[in-house]
Amino acid sequence: MKYQAVIGLEVHVQLKTDSKIFCGCSTSFGSDPNSQTCPVCLGLPGALPVLNKKVVEFAIKAGLATNCSITQRSIFARKNYFYPDLPKGYQISQFEDPVCQWGWLDIELNGETKRIGITRIHMEEDAGKLVHADVPELEDGSGVDLNRACTPLLEVVSEPDLRSSDEAVSYLKQLHQIVTWLGICDGNMEEGSFRCDANVSVMEQGAEKFGTRAEIKNINSFRFVKQAIEYEIQRQIDLIEDGGTVVQETRLFDPDNGVTRSMRSKEEAHDYRYFPDPDLVPLVIDDDWIQRVRQGLPELPEHKKQRFMSEFSIPAYDAEVLTASRPLAEYYEECVACHHDGKAVSNWVMGEVTRGLNDSGLSIENCPVTPRLLGGLLKLMDNGTISGKIAKTVFDEMWKSGKEPAVIVEEQGLVQVSDNGAILAIIDEIMAKNQGQVAEYRSGKDKLFGFFVGQVMKASKGKANPSLVNELLLEKLKG
């Protein structure tokens, strides 16, 4: 019997605000435990929450970028449950009226496009964190760090439109790209800034009714998402084929062993006893506010990708790579403004610039070779001042010193040799030293031509004009 997986993702996006969602405490990561708390995020009696306006703006941005409708009157609700890291005994979230609804993202996989629905995006506060190790004060037990409590989150809930782990990862990567592109999330999955829960079920191929789902909680890498979903799909299929029944439950992914493990029975909405939070008035978002946010949106990745392809005549692969992050796309576009050959710039940004960044551990924002310097280097290649090989030498020196490419070329005597007489003299010398190879070439071994080119370039220390070398060599070797 064949089975079909059905997958929906709930993605938690930690917002990059300076302060928390309902108080003025800092959201910075890595501070001493419980050093960024106040009566509001500690849940002390009488402390009242005040909504952070920046959180609402970020939510509207996310909704517009994912083709959602913005709810113009939404409310906050209390989600009631007990856990040691939840000091109030409830989480302030949204239930019936989320801030964004009914959006979508298109994903591309194996040359095909598929639209994935987004049910809702809602604002909520994060809980604290239980610390099970490295707590000197506790010999045997756990500590509670409430620095993260009240940190602003968006929860992005997809429709159950995903049918494989690859589709889930593709959707997740696109959502990650959008929220980091907008600047509303740093996207750091290791620190929990972007994490997801995967709802997975299986049904017989062609069936209309979905199977019983299991929810895999808090997966924090794309690789783990793929592994967890694939394991869970196979676990459920094996269970059904053995005559068992899939139980609706919450599971955790164990990355060390590549398996999911049962955590608890899966709660339904009524288990949380949602009701409107009496301490927070309804949130009203008027048309003017939505329009102001819309006007402030940057050009989004997919639109920029298509524009790069049409405006700069680069292939889809290049455009995909260059729009992987907003800073990289902006760097490329600034380079093209300095040197108008879009494909040449693309080759250098994807090649030498990326290599330099990887080797030095730098981000594109801190690249020592500015767009102006790279543009200047490419102009020296275009006008024949230096060869492509010499350009790489100049680039490495620019990376180290930040000097102008023309200055480096002059200081190191790297100007390309385009004098026929000088190049012919080198060719004559090479042919005199390699008479055997000359005879073999003239007898039909054309592949030896590359050998002669290499010898001439070596003798000229890479400065001979390659096209002129090829032209003159062909003439001389003909005899």
Curated annotation (Swiss-Prot):
Single annotated GO MF: ATP binding
UniProt cross-references to InterPro entries, sorted A to Z: Asn/Gln-tRNA_amidoTrfase_suB/E, Asn/Gln-tRNA_Trfase_suB/E_cat, Asn/Gln_amidotransferase, Asn/Gln_tRNA_amidoTrase-B-like, GatB, GatB_C_1, GatB_Yqey_C_2, Gln-tRNA_amidoTrfase_suB_CS
Disulfide-bond pairs as recorded: none
Enzyme class per UniProt: ligase
Reaction(s) the record says it catalyses: L-glutamyl-tRNA(Gln) + L-glutamine + ATP + H2O = L-glutaminyl-tRNA(Gln) + L-glutamate + ADP + phosphate + H(+); L-aspartyl-tRNA(Asn) + L-glutamine + ATP + H2O = L-asparaginyl-tRNA(Asn) + L-glutamate + ADP + phosphate + 2 H(+)
Keyword Acetylation among UniProt keywords: no
Subunit (UniProt): Heterotrimer of A, B and C subunits.
Protein name, UniProt field: Aspartyl/glutamyl-tRNA(Asn/Gln) amidotransferase subunit B
Taxon lineage: Bacteria, Pseudomonadati, Thermodesulfobacteriota, Desulfuromonadia, Desulfuromonadales
